[in-house]
Structure formats: structure tokens, C-alpha cells
């Protein structure tokens, strides 16, 4: 309660201050930007061009110049400049981003292997040039040739495309101009960074204009890989977190007169990444024993060896083991790649290092074709958009920064396709007192191969793969999905008085979802005897003597099983291994807002709105009864103030927002032990007791989809800009969030066992509680240092975030994330030698701060992953390092 009183006090104080320094006249003038010297920022959050200071919701807006100076190269970087926004790649894939706005998140991935599929919609959507990017895959590309970028906070359930509960990111690229001209920019920097981008406007006739924008950038990974195997001679020196990106936007605009234009765009992109990885931080030792041995034996290859899926033997770290201790270091070269030995070496390499046997590479190719037509009919403007998007994506996810391969996830989405269309009509009436918008929206998508394959071999098997210690292969690659959405919406703003307006809007959405599921499991090596054992245990396996090949290694025999169960957790026979699921969901959502001009340049507002996210079908779940999840619903309340004023002659812009969100049926993923094909170490069933004692083989943690009943989120956002002098600009922005599950208990469905913590009521939604960013820009003006210069600008930008909120009950304290801050500096020289050329020097992460990306649940990862979140076990804490200090130079030529 205290923080709410403080925040309300801040708002009240700001309004009082504004009243004290503002003109006493009650006459309202809405456009005060020119009077204060502050730039007017135009946004399209309500489907029409408006001053951002006049829109009654929280918005962050940027142009290309601002993004460049703040080093916002991709959507992921928006977390450093926009309050309440947090973006990071999923655990295994650089090309797939989890966008979080106001604590509402996308899934990391249904499988845990990095393939998000079409199972569930995003909580915070991304729209490029009006086209809805429904999937998180492919969002990691470079932002270039940007005209404007807007981040809308809170539910966008009325006007902005598909329903989103957290918010939306809208960005548009530049349209063709009517005169010839353009620019080219080249960049060189650390870690082999090299990039070039540019654009050119080409007027073809008096009414037909073209624009071509191209981008190519490449950078070597900043995490060095030191993997080598002295026994086999294998090695991997591929640095992680590197990328090679290409992109092109080809635009053609026809404008025969002032009332009509049509714009065609072809947006082509390709991305090849060297993959994410993990750095080992430290060892922690618990009290829970591992198969009756010392707890440290829970760490892979600490007390027992194995042969991995590459055929490389890994010997144990310790030679002498009993129920309480593990001693005597193993001198064998085969023990070189045990986890504990690898951990020790990584401490000597430094923070930005790993030893990963196989890189988590990914590659994607993306194409988007769109047409937007605008027609003016006097007081009415009509806009029609149609788009087609297709992409393919492939990759590999292997372990987590480990010097062996015991789980290999391969994914291939060869032919994703989506079609969408939207008609929007804007109008005004009653002498412009009433402004209205109405529209229709359609979207459909399909993916014929919506899954991947997971090869898994337990490190506690204590041997090479055999019919007694089998590899589990799970095949989701034959699954397919199709989703469609239809919506109609209308919204109007009416000026009750010259200084007071009311806005009301409604949207009705109807969603259809279909999935055809044919998941399979293969156990190999296998014999007729081991197959009969499965059958006797009620698992209808089909034996084949055909060898199964993994990474060029042939394993004798295989048992084929269906990876679907009935509602009671019994595996379906191969002859009936299919499930076609159709679901439909529908929901009305609304917006209601009241805004009032207190005085010139100062608006206060109150907005109430609802949001909805469609239910979904998890094609990688095993239990037919647990395949679907209900839709999410949110009820959001926001109050705020937007003010442009002068303080002792200094122009100031201050925007403040407070919000409260009631969140119902939250779609969440929980790591739950999958024991469908698992056995105890002695060959019996993998029971809850055996699992808790660490005595199961062929079990693995699976992400199942659930609906948490209720959560509540309180938060605040602020953005302040001040111009103390004509050569200094100061900006400060930030957010505070207090998100908690208020009712979240669950029982694992049949085929799974209960995790350590099944009651999450009262636990936080994992996000940073505080995020702040500050920017100072100094314009030294025109100078002459032997050659004439235009403006010389120095920009310093600092981002800070608190540690992640997380439920730490099942984790070691070393797995808690930590707060960090990063400082970026940039020096720009414009119009060098009056040639139209600009030059810039930059340095990011000046202090070389060591910082980590957390896991989906807000903690740092641990090895072994199957005990992730199990209290009292032993492990090695890991993290994905954020970039180190990087410097570079950039040159731009305008023509």
C-alpha cells in the first residue's frame, strides 16, 4: 500500500507543480509543443495520426535517429528505452523473442526445445507496417529504415489488430519520397562487427514512386567456446551469440491525386545465428541424495560416467563415492568433460566463455508482402490492408552450455504461412466534436510441420546407451496447426466540452483453432525382450529390429510408441495414435476513457479497458485431456497525466501513469516431470517417491500448459524530458511493477508427476520490479577542427534494472538473479566537411558489466536441468551472458 500512496503523491505533486507554473487562464490550447520548444510526437495508436500527448494511454515513441543514438538495433533492445518493456530471446534460440509488457509474457516454448509453434498467441504483439507478426520466431532481425516506432502499454483489445493483453509494438518503415535521394550507413566494431545499410527514393513518374532499403550486418559471437575432447579429438570453437542478418524492403507507391494512394511492400529477410549458450557460474551442494549416494552425485558425471549422443565417453570426476562423500579426483582424460571439471576451466576463461559440444545454431528466411490503400471521401478516410507472410526456420538446441550432448532438439518449420486483411474507416461529425473509427479484421495462419524431434539420454544412466539404458526419441514433426481470427470493432471520441473528451470502443473477436497431433516416441537400443517388458507394463510398444541412427551412430533395435495418452494417462496404441482437436473462442472487449485538459499543455485521463487472448492447443502435450488452455482475460484500469510546461524558462515534458490489472485464467507453462516412458533405476515404475529420490531413468521435465486462475498487477510508468539549455537535453524514464499470482494451484495430469511446488498462489510473476533509463545529449553546435563540422553531439544512455522477481522455494540462493546497470556512450559529428557525411564513435557497456539473462521463471539455470526447481539437490548455476563492452565506428552519407 505504501508504494501506491507514494506514487499517487508523485502524480499529485507533478500536477500541483504544473498548475503553479502554468498560465492562470482556463482557456485550453491543446498544442503546447511549439510554445515549450518540445517536439510534437505523432502516433497512430488510435488508427489516426495524433499528438502522443493527446492520447489517453501510456505510449513510448521513437524515430530512427533516436533509435540509432540509443543503440536500439533490434526489438530486444527496447527494454533499455521503454518503461515496463522486457524482451529477451528464448532459452535456445536467438531468433525467437519473448516480449513482455507490464508483466504479461509469451511462452518460452511449449517443448522446452525452442520451438514456439502455433500453440498460443503472444501476450504482447508486434506489428510491422501494419502487418501482424503472429509468431515470436523471426523477431530478432535488425531494425532499419524506421519512420516511427510506438510501444503501447496495456490491453489493446479494441483497435489494434488482434487482441493482446499486455500491449503492442507498432513500427513502420519509411515510404517512398517524391524526390531522388537516400543514404548509406556503414558500421565497424568489436567482435568482427560489420554492417551496411541504406535506402534510396526513386521517383518513376509524377505519381509513381519507389524506395529500396537494404541492410546487411554480421558479428562474431561474443561468448568464446573452448570445447575439446581429448579422447575423441573433437572440438568446437564456434563463438556463441553471433549473427548474420540480411534484409530488404522494396516499396512502390502510386498516388494519382490527393485523395487516393496505394502502397505495395515486399519485406525479405534472412537470419543465421551461431546460437545461445550458457556460462557455468558456480557449484552448489545440497542434501538430497542421488541414487543413495552423496548429493553431489546429482551433478552429471560427478560420480558416474556415460557415453553421450555423440559417442563420446565421459568419465566421473570422483573415484571414491559413498552415501555422504565423493572424493579422489579421476586422472583419466575421459573425465576432462565432466561438468565439475568444465566449471573449473570456465572460471579461468572468464565470464564470456563456455564449453559447448554442439552449437545451438538457427536459421530463418522470412517474406512479407503487403498492400495498403488509402482513400479520402471528404470527412471520411478509408484504409484497406492485405498481407501475406511466409517463413521457414531450422535449428538445433543441444544441452545448455555443456561439454557433451545428452539431449538434442532439432526443429524445422518449412512452410509457415499467414494471410490477413483489415478495413479501417475514420470519420468525424458534429463540427469535429465526434471522431469515430470502425473496422473489420481477418487473420489466418497454418503450419503443416509444427514441431521438432528431441533425442534424450539420461546422464544418470551410468553407461553407454543400451537396451537397459535407452535413448528416448520424441517426434512432434508430423503435427500441424491452423488458426483463424475474425473481428469487428468501433470506437468514438466525443468532445463533451472544449477541454473534456470521452472515448468508448468495443470489439468482438471470434477465434478458431485446429491441431492434428501425431506425436511418437522411440526407445533405442531395444530388443524383443525389452519391448515385451513395456507391453507388460501397459505401454503398447511395437518392436522393430531396424537400427536407429542418431548423429551417425547406429543403435540396434527400436521400440515405437505413441506419445499420446488417453485422459487417464494410458498410452494410446500405434493404430490410434492421433488426435484432431478443434476449438473456438469468442469474446467482446471494450475501451472507456475520459480525458481532460487542466490547462494549456496538461492533460489528465482515466482509462478502463478489457483484453482477451485466445485459448490454444498445445501440440506437444501428451495427455489428450490436457491439450487445451482457456482464453486469458484482463481488466485494466489506468490513470495518468501528460504535461508540457516551462519550469523557470526550461521546457519540460512529464508523463506519468498508474495502472492496475486484474488477470484471469492466465496461460502459463510449468515444468512437470514426464514419466510416460520412465522407469526406476531398478526397472520398476517411476513413482513419485522414486522421482523425489532421484532414482528414475528416462524421465524429463516437460512444459505443460495451465490456466492460473487469478493474478493482479499494480504498476507505474514515467517519462520526463527537460531542455535546461538549447544545447542540453535530459530524459529519464522508468517503471515499477508489483505482479502476483493470487490463485494458482494445479494438479499434474495423468502421465506426469507432481513437481516440488504445485501451489504458486502468492508467488510473483517473473519480471524485474524496477526498470529505469536516463539519457543526456549535449549538442556542442557547429565546430571547425581543421575541417568544418555541423553539429557535434555527445549522448550518454544508462539502463538499470532490479533483479527478477521469482519463486525461490525450490532453488538454491545462487540461482537468484541480480540487479545490473549498463552505460552506453556515443559521439556524433554531423555534416563533416559540409559533405553530407556523418561520423559517429560509440562504446556500449562501458564498465564491462557482467550480467545474465534469466530463465523463463526468473531464476538462473542449473545443471542438471531435470532437477531444476527441486529443493535440496546439487547442481551448477548457469546463465546466458549479456554482451560485454563493445566499441565501434559508424559513417553515414546522405545524398
Put a short name on every predicted segment.
Residues 121-123, 135, 142-153, 158-248, ...:
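Outer-membrane beta-barrel translocator/receptor signature
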Residues 178-179, 187, 201-305, 354, ...:
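Periplasmic-side early beta-strands and strand-to-turn transitions of outer-membrane beta-barrels
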Residues 253-255, 425-426, 435-443, 479-661:
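Structural signature of Gram-negative outer-membrane beta-barrels, strongest in the C-terminal barrel
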Amino acid at each position: 500500500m505504501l508504494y501506491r500512496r507514494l506514487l499517487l503523491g508523485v502524480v499529485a505533486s507533478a500536477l500541483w507543480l504544473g498548475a503553479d507554473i502554468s498560465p492562470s487562464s482556463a482557456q485550453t490550447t491543446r498544442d503546447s509543443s511549439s510554445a515549450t520548444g518540445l517536439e510534437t510526437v505523432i502516433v497512430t495508436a488510435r488508427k489516426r495520426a495524433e499528438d502522443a500527448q493527446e492520447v489517453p494511454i501510456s505510449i513510448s515513441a521513437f524515430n530512427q535517429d533516436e533509435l540509432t543514438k540509443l543503440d536500439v538495433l533490434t526489438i530486444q533492445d527496447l527494454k533499455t528505452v521503454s518503461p515496463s518493456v522486457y524482451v529477451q530471446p528464448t532459452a535456445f534460440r536467438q531468433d525467437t523473442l519473448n516480449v513482455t509488457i507490464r508483466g504479461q509474457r509469451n511462452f518460452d516454448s511449449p517443448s522446452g526445445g525452442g520451438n514456439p509453434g502455433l500453440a498460443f498467441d503472444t501476450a504482447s504483439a508486434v506489428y510491422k507496417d501494419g502487418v501482424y507478426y503472429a509468431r515470436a520466431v523471426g523477431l530478432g532481425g535488425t531494425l532499419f529504415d524506421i519512420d516511427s516506432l510506438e510501444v503501447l502499454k496495456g490491453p489493446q483489445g479494441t483497435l489494434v489488430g488482434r487482441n493482446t493483453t499486455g500491449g503492442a509494438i507498432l513500427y513502420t518503415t519509411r515510404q517512398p519520397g517524391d524526390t531522388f535521394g537516400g543514404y548509406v550507413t556503414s558500421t565497424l566494431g568489436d567482435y568482427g562487427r560489420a554492417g551496411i545499410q541504406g535506402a534510396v527514393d526513386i521517383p518513376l513518374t509524377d505519381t509513381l514512386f519507389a524506395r529500396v532499403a537494404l541492410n546487411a550486418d554480421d558479428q562474431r559471437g561474443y561468448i568464446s567456446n573452448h570445447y575439446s575432447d581429448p579422447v575423441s579429438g573433437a572440438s568446437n570453437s564456434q563463438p556463441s551469440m553471433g549473427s548474420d542478418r540480411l534484409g530488404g524492403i522494396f516499396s512502390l507507391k502510386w498516388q494519382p491525386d490527393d485523395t487516393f494512394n496505394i502502397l505495395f511492400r515486399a519485406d525479405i529477410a534472412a537470419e543465421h545465428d551461431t546460437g545461445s549458450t550458457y556460462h557455468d557460474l558456480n557449484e552448489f551442494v545440497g542434501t538430497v541424495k542421488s541414487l543413495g549416494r552423496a548429493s553431489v552425485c546429482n551433478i552429471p558425471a560427478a560420480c558416474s560416467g556415460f557415453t553421450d549422443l555423440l559417442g563420446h565417453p565421459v568419465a566421473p570426476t570422483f573415484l571414491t563415492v559413498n552415501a555422504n562423500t565423493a572424493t579422489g579426483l579421476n586422472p583419466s582424460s575421459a573425465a576432462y568433460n565432466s561438468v565439475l571439471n568444465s566449471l573449473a576451466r570456465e572460471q579461468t576463461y572468464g565470464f564470456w566463455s563456455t564449453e559447448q559440444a554442439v552449437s545451438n545454431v538457427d536459421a530463418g528466411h522470412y517474406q512479407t508482402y503487403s498492400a495498403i490503400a488509402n482513400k479520402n471521401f471528404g470527412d471520411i478516410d478509408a484504409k484497406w490492408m492485405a498481407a501475406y507472410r511466409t517463413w521457414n526456420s531450422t535449428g538445433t538446441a543441444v544441452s545448455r552450455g555443456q561439454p557433451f550432448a545428452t539431449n538434442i532438439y532439432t526443429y524445422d518449420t518449412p512452410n509457415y504461412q499467414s494471410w490477413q486483411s483489415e478495413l479501417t474507416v475514420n470519420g468525424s461529425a458534429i463540427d469535429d466534436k465526434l471522431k469515430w473509427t470502425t473496422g473489420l479484421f481477418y487473420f489466418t495462419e497454418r503450419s503443416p510441420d509444427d514441431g521438432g524431434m528431441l533425442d534424450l539420454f539420461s546422464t544418470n544412466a551410468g553407461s553407454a546407451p543400451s537396451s537397459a539404458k535407452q535413448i528416448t526419441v520424441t517426434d512432434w514433426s508430423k503435427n500441424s496447426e491452423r488458426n483463424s481470427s475474425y473481428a469487428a470493432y468501433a470506437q468514438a471520441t466525443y468532445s463533451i466540452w472544449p477541454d473534456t473528451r470521452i472515448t468508448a470502443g468495443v470489439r468482438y473477436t471470434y477465434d478458431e483453432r485446429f491441431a492434428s497431433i501425431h506425436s511418437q516416441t522411440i526407445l533405442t537400443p531395444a530388443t524383443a525382450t525389452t519391448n515385451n517388458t513395456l507391453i507388460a507394463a501397459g505401454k503398447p510398444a511395437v518392436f522393430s529390429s531396424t537400427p536407429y541412427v542418431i548423429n551417425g551412430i547406429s543403435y540396434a533395435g527400436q521400440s515405437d510408441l505413441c506419445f499420446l495418452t488417453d485422459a487417464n494417462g494410458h498410452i494410446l496404441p500405434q493404430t490410434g495414435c492421433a488426435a484432431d482437436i478443434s476449438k473456438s473462442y469468442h469474446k467482446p472487449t471494450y475501451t472507456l476513457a475520459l480525458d481532460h485538459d487542466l490547462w494549456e499543455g496538461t492533460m489528465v485521463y482515466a482509462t478502463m479497458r478489457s483484453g482477451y487472448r485466445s485459448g490454444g492447443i498445445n501440440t506437444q502435450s501428451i495427455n489428450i485431456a490436457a491439450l487445451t488452455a482457456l482464453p486469458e482475460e484482463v481488466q485494466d484500469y489506468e490513470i495518468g497525466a501528460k504535461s508540457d510546461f516551462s519550469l523557470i524558462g526550461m521546457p519540460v515534458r512529464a508523463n506519468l501513469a498508474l495502472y492496475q490489472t486484474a488477470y484471469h485464467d492466465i496461460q502459463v507453462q510449468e515444468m512437470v516431470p514426464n514419466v510416460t516412458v520412465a522407469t526406476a533405476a531398478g526397472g520398476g515404475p517411476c513413482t513419485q517417491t522414486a522421482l523425489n529420490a532421484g532414482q528414475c531413468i528416462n524421465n524429463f521435465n516437460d512444459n505443460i500448459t495451465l490456466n492460473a486462475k487469478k493474478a493482479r498487477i499494480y504498476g507505474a510508468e514515467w517519462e520526463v524530458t527537460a531542455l535546461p539549455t538549447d544545447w542540453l537535453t535530459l530524459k529519464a524514464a522508468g517503471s515499477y511493477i508489483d505482479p502476483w499470482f493470487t490463485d494458482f494451484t494445479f494438479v499434474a495430469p495423468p502421465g506426469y508427476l507432481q513437481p516440488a511446488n504445485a501451489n504458486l498462489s502468492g508467488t510473483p510473476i517473473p519480471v524485474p520490479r524496477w526498470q529505469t533509463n536516463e539519457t543526456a545529449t549535449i549538442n556542442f553546435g557547429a565546430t571547425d577542427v581543421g575541417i568544418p563540422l555541423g553539429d557535434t553531439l555527445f549522448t550518454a544512455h544508462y539502463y538499470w534494472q532490479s533483479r527478477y522477481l521469482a519463486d525461490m522455494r525450490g532453488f538454491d540462493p545462487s540461482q537468484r538473479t541480480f540487479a545490473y546497470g549498463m552505460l552506453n556512450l556515443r559521439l556524433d559529428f554531423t555534416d563533416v566537411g559540409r559533405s553530407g557525411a556523418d561520423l559517429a564513435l560509440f562504446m556500449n557497456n562501458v564498465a564491462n558489466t557482467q550480467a545474465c539473462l534469466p530463465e523463463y521463471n526468473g531464476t538462473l539455470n542449473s545443471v542438471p536441468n531435470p532437477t531444476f526447481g527441486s529443493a535440496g539437490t546439487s547442481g551448477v548455476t548457469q546463465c546466458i551472458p549479456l554482451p560485454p563492452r563493445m566499441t565501434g565506428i559508424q559513417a553515414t552519407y546522405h545524398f
